[in-house]
Amino acid sequence: ADWEKLVEGAGIIGDSELIIDDTPGISISELRSKCRKYKLEHDLKLVIIDYLQLMTGSGRSTDSRQQEISDISRSLKALARELNVPVVALSQLSRAVEQRPDHRPMLSDLRESGAIEQDADVVMFIYRDDYYNKDTELKGISEIIIAKQRNGPIGTVNLAWLPEYTKFANLEH
C-alpha cells in the first residue's frame, strides 16, 4: 500500500508544472529573468528560495555581504509585486539563537540583514523543544512562530512533527 502511494505521489508530481531550478549561487538578476520566462510559459504561481544566503546580489565589489543580502531581499519583494506571485524565501539564522537559554528564534536572529525583516510581509520560524531538551514533555511538537504578519495577527501555532515522514500535522485533541 505504501509503495502504491509513493508511485501515485510521484505520478502527481511528475504531471504537475513543478519546476526545480538548482542553479548554484544564482544571482537575483538571473532569478528574475527565469521567473519572468516561467511566468509567460507556465503561469508561475509561487517562487520558493532555498535559501536566501546562497544567492548572489548585483556583484558590486563595494557591497558588504549585509548590503548584498539587503539588495536581494528588496529585489525579491519587487519580483513578487511585478509577477503578482508569492515569494517564499528561507533564511539562515544567526548563531545568537544558540547562545540564549530560550532558543526560540526572534526577528533579530535573521542572519546578515535587518532588511529581510523589513521587506517581508510574513516571517515565520519553526521551534522544536525536543531538539534542544531531550527530556522535554513536548516531544514531537513543533511551534510555528508567526513573528511578523503585515496584515494579520502574530502568535504561535503548535503542530505535530512526524520526522519519519518529514511532515507537520494538526495536533490530535
Please report, for each region that a protein language model flagged, where it lies by residue.
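Cytosolic-facing regulatory segments adjacent to core modules
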Residues: 1-43, 57, 157-160
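Phosphate-binding/switch region of NTP-binding enzymes
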Residues: 67-173
